[in-house]
UniProtKB/Swiss-Prot annotation:
Its EC number is 6.3.2.9. Belongs to the MurCDEF family. It comes from Bacillus licheniformis (strain ATCC 14580 / DSM 13 / JCM 2505 / CCUG 7422 / NBRC 12200 / NCIMB 9375 / NCTC 10341 / NRRL NRS-1264 / Gibson 46). ATP binds at residues 120-126. The keyword Transport does not apply. It is found in: Cytoplasm. This is UDP-N-acetylmuramoylalanine--D-glutamate ligase. It catalyses: UDP-N-acetyl-alpha-D-muramoyl-L-alanine + D-glutamate + ATP = UDP-N-acetyl-alpha-D-muramoyl-L-alanyl-D-glutamate + ADP + phosphate + H(+). One of its GO terms (biological process) is cell wall organization. The keyword Chloroplast does not apply. InterPro entries: Mur-like_cat_sf, Mur_ligase_C, Mur_ligase_C_dom_sf, Mur_ligase_cen, MurD. One of its GO terms (cellular component) is cytoplasm. It is an enzyme of class 6 (ligase). One of its GO terms (molecular function) is UDP-N-acetylmuramoylalanine-D-glutamate ligase activity.
């Protein structure tokens, strides 16, 4: 798509200079689009702002002056996905009827390359990685983008028309899309998450539904038959539906039958040959299979990946065995469902390290999955809630610490040979760490210090 035609004579305000905002501002400036950047961080502390200013981009830092809308006759606002809609600049834009994009929408307008859009409450990163690796294993041209790493607009700006752009999409990113239309769209699952941001389950579902909403008859919607909400939300899509199910046998789509992974009634490979740990990953595998078979990937390429792929960093990542204690980093478990799945993967004593940003959740849903938990080490804003949970479960060994580094040390001191020490916080990291990656890296480093 021709960005200059779309944004001709348009004035764009980029709000927030994390990686997506920086990428959007840089690309628009390079294409000659009139752009101004606004970021809360003071200019002298803001390296991305200084780089943009050196390029000739107008940058306003340290506050959010609504005067910018009139001063620059703003037509479109592109915001960092993490910035809430209660932000004064976002509220002002909406009040004026100005579209509020995330850079995923911009990415869509930068290229004719087909998008594979992958979203869901859990499993996005693993599924995105599986799809990308399977495409590459079959010598398909593919790029990976979005919530998983490189900003979508940066990838799209470099993509050729015959490359698949495999894009991990959060609800925050999707909420700021208008015309974004993935050639293949997937909603893995839906449950209560990010309600502090979206304010209601309905709003959260509407954001997730954007992965399907703009699809046409020539597109494909991959649908989880085991999730009633996903099935309902997919009804808006005009695309061909391709289904997968962990629980039932399907003649069309992906499932498991007689110990084999199946697609359209034909065996792809024995389930026992899959090396990716955890039953919860079967959902991700079947979803990825639907996507790549739609894209023409061979069974041989699927088998090549599934017999070697052991998982992604920060998602049930094996870290080390120290004195016969097994350490796992599941820092990407930023919600309750992810931690439920992590706990269900082990049939031996577990020391759970949990806590983080308090979004108002209670954690009673974890109780049925805590039968193997022998101790809880907790930290962050939700520490009191996890202490209460442990008490209600009759867990005697409970300790509150300041951070994940201390949690690793405390867990090791409480552990016995054969124990699993599992960081699976069930909470976002933002009360103490910039990202779940930073939290996970701090934990991994602390574990290695125990050797």
């Amino acid at each position: 798509m021709d960005t200059q035609d779309l944004l001709q004579n348009q004035n764009v305000l980029v709000l927030g200079l994390a990686k997506s905002g920086y990428a959007a501002a840089s690309i628009l400036h390079e294409k000659g689009v009139k752009v101004v950047v606004n970021d809360q961080l003071p200019f002298e502390e803001n390296e991305p702002a200084r780089i943009l200013a050196e390029k000739g981009v107008e940058v306003v830092c340290g506050s959010h002056p609504t005067e910018l809308f009139d001063l620059h006759s703003i037509d479109i606002l592109i915001k960092n996905p993490g910035i809430r809609y209660e932000n004064v600049m976002v509220e002002e834009a909406l009040k004026r009827g100005i579209p509020v994009w995330t850079e995923v929408e911009l990415a869509y307008h930068l290229t004719d390359a087909p998008f594979i859009g992958i979203t869901g409450s859990n499993g996005k990163t693993t599924t995105t990685t599986l799809v990308y690796e399977m495409l590459k294993a079959d010598s398909k041209k593919a790029l990976v983008a979005g919530n998983i790493g490189t900003a979508a607009s940066e990838v799209a700006n470099q993509a050729s028309g015959d490359e698949w752009i495999v894009t991990e999409l959060s609800s925050f990113q999707l909420m700021g899309t208008y015309q974004f239309r993935p050639k293949i769209g997937l909603l893995l699952n839906v449950f209560d998450a990010h309600l502090d941001y979206h304010h209601s389950r309905k709003n959260y579902e509407l954001a997730k539904q954007q992965v399907y909403r703009n699809q046409s008859e020539t597109d494909v919607a991959v649908v989880n038959l085991d999730d009633e909400t996903v099935v309902r939300l997919a009804e808006c899509s005009k695309a061909e539906k391709v289904y997968f199910s962990v629980r039932r046998t399907l003649e069309r789509g992906a499932c498991v039958k007689d110990g084999a992974i199946m697609f359209n009634g034909e065996p792809v490979m024995p389930l026992e040959d899959v090396v990716l740990p955890g039953e919860h990953n079967l959902e991700n595998i079947l979803a990825a299979l639907c996507i790549v078979k739609t894209a023409g990937v061979s069974d041989a390429a699927v088998r090549k990946v599934l017999t070697s792929f052991t998982g992604v960093k920060h998602r049930m990542q094996y870290v080390a065995t120290i004195k016969n204690r097994l350490f796992y980093n599941d820092s990407k478990a930023t919600n309750i469902l992810a931690t439920k799945k992590a706990l269900s993967a082990f049939q031996k004593p577990v020391i759970l390290l949990a806590g983080g940003l308090d979004r108002g959740n209670e954690f009673d849903e974890l109780k049925p999955h805590m039968s193997f938990v022998k101790a809880v080490i907790t930290f962050g804003e939700t520490a009191p809630k996890f202490e209460k949970l442990a008490e209600e479960m009759g867990i005697q060994q409970v300790k509150r610490v300041d951070n994940v580094e201390q949690a690793a040390t405390a867990a090791f001191s409480l552990s016995d040979e054969g124990d699993v020490i599992l960081l699976s916080p069930a909470c976002a990291s933002w009360d103490q760490y910039k990202t779940f990656e930073e939290r996970g890296d701090m934990f991994v480093n602390a574990v290695h210090m125990l050797k």
